[in-house]
């Protein structure tokens, strides 16, 4: 599992994984099998037991969600880069909070998720710093 060789004591890159889902989370995941996992409100990573991801895909999702928690709780600076017009359009419905949109784009770039679309040099620089902070190779 990622995180075991980064200097963090537990979890995925220092963020805990919660196996037991709360009732609302279970229902959400059951209705949304396309949502692979999330950074839960308790700042733990939760995975969707109804998604059909491979182990490698699950690892990428956990990396993505760990990065989002680090940004959310202030362990790493909040992204302040600009989204491209294509990213603005693609993530317009993701959240009403602009920081959530920036954080998800950064985390998706970090985990090599193509849904982040084409990153700008500013986004790449931010993600390189995030990668170094998290100890991601």
Regions found by a protein language model. Name each.
Residues 13-59, 66-72:
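Active-site scaffold of zinc-dependent metalloenzymes
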Residues 1-14:
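Zn2+-dependent metallopeptidase catalytic core
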Residues 63-64, 79:
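General N-terminal targeting signals
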Residues 67-75, 84, 111:
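Active-site-flanking alpha-helical
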Residues 5-7, 37-38, 94-95:
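A general structural signal for short secondary-structure junctions and capping/turn motifs
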Residues 17, 29-33, 56, 79-137:
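Metalloprotease/metallohydrolase-associated module, dominated by Zn2+-dependent proteases
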